[in-house]
Amino acid sequence: MYMARCGPKNNVLCFPFQLSFLFSKRLINKRFKYTLQTEDEKDMMGSLSKNKIITPEDVEFKLAQLREFSNTLKERIHNTKSVNSDGHQSNSIAPISEDSRNVNVTKISSVPNEEKSKNLSDLIHSSFLEKMDHLVPKVIRERVADDDILAKNLFDRSHSNWAPVIDRLYVSEKRFMDIDSREFSVWLNGTVKYLPFHSILHLDEMLLEQINGDVVKFNTHMYECIFNNLGNLKPTNFNQDGTNDKVILKMKELLERYDKALKITEERINKKEGFPCKVPKMTQAILNNCLKYSTKCSSFHDMDYFITKFRDDYGITPNKQNLTTVIQFYSRKEMTKQAWNTFDTMKFLSTKHFPDICTYNTMLRICEKERNFPKALDLFQEIQDHNIKPTTNTYIMMARVLASSSSNAVVSEGKSDSLRLLGWKYLHELEDKNLYRHKKDDLNSFLAMMALAAFDGDIELSRALYYLFIAKKYKTLCANWKGNILVDQDTIWKSTLMPEMLNYLMLAYARFDPRNLPVLSGYEKGIELRRKFLREFDSSMRLDDTDKLVKFKLPFLPISDLNSEAQVLAESNAIWSFNLENGGTRNTLTSSNEAALEDIKKYRQLLDSFAQEAEDFNEFKFKVMYEVTKMQRESINVNVFNKISLHTYLSIPINLKQQKEFLRRLTFFTFQQHEFEAVIKRLYEGYRNIPSSHTRDQNSISTEAISVSKPETTEDLNLIMHDIWYITCLRHKIMMDTTLYELVMKAAIEFQNEDLAKKVWNDRGKFRTTVPFLKMDQRIRIAKDQKFAHLMVEFFTKQGKYSDAIAIILSSKNRFNWTYSMVRNLHKALEEIEDRNSVEILLDVVNKKSHAKALKWEEQELNM
C-alpha cells in the first residue's frame, strides 16, 4: 500500500494512498470554490470601474491549468512510497476508522488561511512552469513573452501547433540571436513539426540570422527540421504536377545552400583560414522528405532529380523507405513496369533494402490493377518464405486480386470459380487469425467480399452486404451527429453512400443468372458465412428499432430472392436513383411538367444574361459550363455519379439483352460533346439578337416580354425551348468518352443493331475532332482507336459482312498492331466458309512485322 505524508513536518501523520488522495481532493475542491468566489467578487468590483470581458478561451485555459495541477499532485502522491525512518511504517499502521477519518478531515480542512503557504493559483502556476520547461527552452519562453500562446498551442502534444509560436518569435526583438545553435537545433529538429509554408520561411530566416548568415554553420539538424516540415506540406489543387511549386523550389534552394557550404568549407581548408569546422551532412531522412513531397505532386521529374542529386553529389542511395515511396508513386501513376523493376531491385540489392510487408501490399495492389493473379500468388508465397508477417490488408488484397482476375475467362484461364473460391478462403483465414484491424480495414473487408460476390453474380449476398455496410455507417453517423438529424439528412446521406459499394452492387445485377449456383454454397464454411449475412439482411422492414426517430430505408424490393430480369432492372433503377438523389433527399430525376416549365423559364433568363455579358462565344460557353457544374453539385450526389459506376449501370441491360432499357438509360444519363457545342452555339447566336434584359420588365417571364429583331416563329421558339431544356438536363448527364462509345458498340454487337452501330461510328468520329479527345496522349488515342476498330470488326463478323471487317483491318494495318486474338472470330468464320484468299490476306496482316517498324517501336520505347 502506498503511503502519503500530510500535515506539518513536526507532527507527521501517515495515511493510506486512497485516503490521502481523498484529503487532497477535498482540499482542492474547497480551495477552488474559495478562489472562484474571491475571483467572482473581484470581477464584480472591477466591472464597475472598467469593462472586462472574460472570453471562453480564458476559461478553458484556466480549467486546463487546474487539470494539469491535479494530475501533477496525483503523481506526486502516487510516487511517495515510504516515509522517513523516524515516521511510522506502513505495516505497523492500524486501519483508520470512519470516525477518525471524519475527524482528521475536519481538522485538516479547518486549517486557518493564514497558515497556507501557497494558494491554488500559486500551485497552478508552479505546475505550469514545470510543464512548460519540458516543452520549450527557458530562453524561448522569455522571448515569446506570452504564456497564453504557449499553453493554448503546445499543452496538447497530440495537437500541438507551433505556427503561432514561430510567428511570435519572428516579430520579437532578439529572435534566435545569442542562443547556442548546436543544442538549440537538436531540440528544434525533434520538436517543431507541421508548420505552414510561411512559418517555415520565418524559421529558416531566423536560423540564418542566428548564425550571422554563415551557411557553413547551418548544421544537419537545421536542414532536417526544415525539410521535415516541407515534406509534410500538401500541394495546392491547382499545382498537382509540381511545376514551379514553391515547396519544390525551396527544397532546391536549400540544396544549393548546402552545396555552397561545401564549396566554402573546401576553400577554407585549402587556404587554411579560421578554425576547422564540422561539415553538415545530408541524410536519408532529408532524401525521404524530398521524395515524399514529390510523390504528392505526382512529379516524376522532381523525384528523379532528387534521387540523382543525392546519389551523384552526396553519395546517398535510396534506402528501403525511399524505394517504397517510389513504388507507391509508380502505383498511383499506373507506371507498373517501373514499379516491378524497382521492386526487383529492392529484393536483390541487399538485406537492408529487402521489401517489407508495406511494399508487398503495394505490389499486390498493382496485381489487382493488372489482374495478374499468378504474380500475386507468388508474392504471397515469398511473404511466407521470408517469414514476413502478413497484415489484414495483405489477405484483403489477395481476395481482391483473385476477384478481379476472375472477371475474365481469358485472364482466369477458365478457372473463374476456383479463383473466387480461393479468394474466400483467404478471407476465412483472415477471420481465423484475428489480426489487428485498422479503422479502414472493415471497409476494405466489405469491399473484398462485395467484389467476390459481385463477380460471382451472387445478387442475394451482394444486396445483404450492401445493406449491412450502408446501415452500419448511416447509424454510426446518426449516433455521433451533433446537429439535427432530420434536418441534416442530405449531408448524412452524402457521407454514407459510397461509389465503390454502388459499383459492385450494379456489377452483381449485371452478372445476374438464375441458373448459377454461388461459390459459397459449395462448402460448409461458405454456407455458414453466407447464411449469416442473409439472416442479418431484412429486405422488407429496414427500420432502426433502437431509435424510432431515425428511419433507415433502402429501395430494395420486398423479396429475398430476385428471380427475373424485370425485378433486376427495377431494383437496379431504384438503387441507382436513390444514390444519385442522395438518399432520396433530392428530386432531380423525376419532375412534373410544371416544374420543367419553371426550370426552362428560369434558365432562359439566366442564359440571356450570360449572352449579354459575355464578350465572345468562348466566354459564354465557359459561363454555361460553370453553371451546369454548379447545378450538378446542387442536385446530384457527384460522389457516386461517375463514369465507372455509370458504365456498370449501363452494362446491366446489355447483359440481360434489354435493348429498349439500355437506350433509355444511355439517353437519360449521357450527352455528346459535339451536340452540346451545337446547342451552345445556337443559343448564343439567338440571344445575341435579343436586346439587353435591362429594358425588359424584370418581374415578367412570359414570352411576350421578349422582343427580338425579327419575328420568332413557333418553330424557333420550340427550338429555343428544346435547347434550354437540353442544358437543364445536363445536371444528371455525363459526357460520352471513348470508353462509353466502346460500350455502345458492344451493345450494338449484342443486339445486332446495325443502325446503332452506324450511329456510334459517326458519333465517335465527331468526338475525335473535339478538344477532350485531342488533349489525350497520342499513345492513348491510338490504343483507343484500335480498341474501337476491333469492336467494329467483331460487329461485321457477327453480321456476316466479312469483306467489311477485312476492309477495316487492311485500312489500318499500318497504324494498328493487329494480333491474332483480335481477329480470331473472323479467322474462324472465314475458315468455315473456306475463303482461302481472305484467310491468307488476314494472316499476312497479323504475321507481317517489318524490321523497320520493329526498330521504330523499340526506339520509341527506349525514349520513353
Swiss-Prot record:
It is found in: Mitochondrion. One of its GO terms (biological process) is mRNA processing. Its main location: mitochondrion. Residues 1-76 form a transit peptide. Coiled coil: none annotated. Pfam families: PPR_2. Involved in mitochondrial-nuclear incompatibility, a major determinant in reproductive isolation between species, through hybrid incompatibility of Ccm1 and its interacting partner 15S rRNA between yeast species. Belongs to the CCM1 family. This is Mitochondrial 15S rRNA processing factor CCM1.
